[in-house]
């Protein structure tokens, strides 16, 4: 687990956008999310397309997530361009 935390902190904030993450702490433990932004060095903004939409995202501490290798370029482009269909794309992913 420490390895993942170090890896997450070493990534640039823009590198995290579009990455799929797994929550490993809290009520949402085991849920998958897509990183749609960052608040600070320790917090990211997450969305799953259904319960946590782009308009009402979840904020989560970097220590409480595991970053998976999955990233979809279409979703990343949609997040960056603030496309209206982003929630649907995230939900289908």
Model-derived features: where do they sit?
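Ferredoxin-like alpha/beta domains used as RNA- or RNAP-binding modules
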Residues: 2-17, 24-25, 34-93
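Short N-terminal binding/cap micro-motifs at the start of the first secondary-structure element
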Residues: 29-31
